[in-house]
Each structure stands twice: as C-alpha cells, then as structure tokens.
Amino acid sequence: MVKESIPKEGQTIKIQSYKHDGNIHRVWSETTILKGTEHVVIGGNDHTLVTESDSRTWITREPAIVYFHSEFWFNVICMFREDGVYYYCNLSSPFVCDDEALKYIDYDLDIKVYPNGKYHLLDEDEYEQHMRQMNYSSDIDVILRRNVDILQQWIEQKKGPFAPDFIKVWRERYKKIRNY
C-alpha cells in the first residue's frame, strides 16, 4: 500500500507518469512545489531532466508551471516561450503523491493550446490503439471523454490554469522561490 503525502511549498519532487499497464512512461526529475493541498498541486520547473520509458533523456526548454487536480482526469503544463504561453494538457488519472513522487497514469489523449487560444486534440489514434492493447474499460473511456469536454470548457472560458491571473501569480511565485 502506498502512503500518500502532500508535498510542501518549496519542496522539490519528481513527477512520474505511468501507462495503464503499470509501466513507467516518463519521469521529470525536479519540480518545485508552489502549492500543495489534498486536491491541488501546482509546481514549477525549468530546464528539467526528463527520462523516457526507453531510458532516453532530454531537458525541458523553457520554464513551466504544472497543474494537477485530484478530482479531474487531466493535468496541465503551462510553458513560457518567447511568443507567449503554450499549454500542453494530458488526459490522465487524478494524481497521487507519496514519498517518492507525484504519480499519475497517462491516457494518451492530449490537448495543445496556443497563445492565441486555439487548441487541438492530439493522439486520438494512439488512444484507440492503447485502449485495445491495454484493455481500458468502457468506464475509463467515458470518464476520459467527459474530461476532454471539461478541459475544452476550461480553455474556452479561461478557467483554472488558463486564467490570465493564474499564469501571473504562479510564475511570480516560482521566480520568488527560485530567486530568479
């Protein structure tokens, strides 16, 4: 049994993404916690080492704020680039935290949001393939489709991590904690 823990502000944690079959998908080596509660974790990272399931590694190119919620089946990465804020949204299980890392199951579907507010649903073919290969239940499919709709509403309504104030507040908090 995994003992859950809530990460504390200023703490540095790993983020571990898994696939439905239990295999590790991707690991971010360092994310600084900006807010940690039972329901929401907000973190920041910059030039962070990422390790893929096949052991390949790469380093993130820009500062990012990450948003996880315990009641929604998605997480959001807000990436700060020269031409504006891009969002990469992963359809995923709600997060859990233990002493090792923040963890979630990646369910393939992604939404990319551009600085102008336009967005695209990505990886539908990968989702269909993995749904068959890993036997996603019909319940999970319904939950994920519902959360795609919720996520699209949040994007269109500029709610949660898509709100301009969210970006301003949490980017400043990250800079302060990291002494930028």
UniProtKB/Swiss-Prot annotation:
The keyword Hydrolase applies. Mg(2+) 2 binds at residues 108, 110, 123, 126. It catalyses: a ribonucleoside 5'-triphosphate + H2O = a ribonucleoside 5'-diphosphate + phosphate + H(+); a ribonucleoside 5'-diphosphate + H2O = a ribonucleoside 5'-phosphate + phosphate + H(+). Its cofactor is Mg(2+). GO terms for molecular function: magnesium ion binding; nucleoside diphosphate phosphatase activity; ribonucleoside triphosphate phosphatase activity. Mg(2+) 1 binds at residues 90, 106, 110. Keywords: Hydrolase, Magnesium, Metal-binding. It comes from the Bacteria. The keyword Protein biosynthesis does not apply. The active site is at 26 (proton donor). Its EC number is 3.6.1.15, 3.6.1.6. Belongs to the Ntdp family. Has nucleoside phosphatase activity towards nucleoside triphosphates and nucleoside diphosphates. This is Nucleoside triphosphate/diphosphate phosphatase.
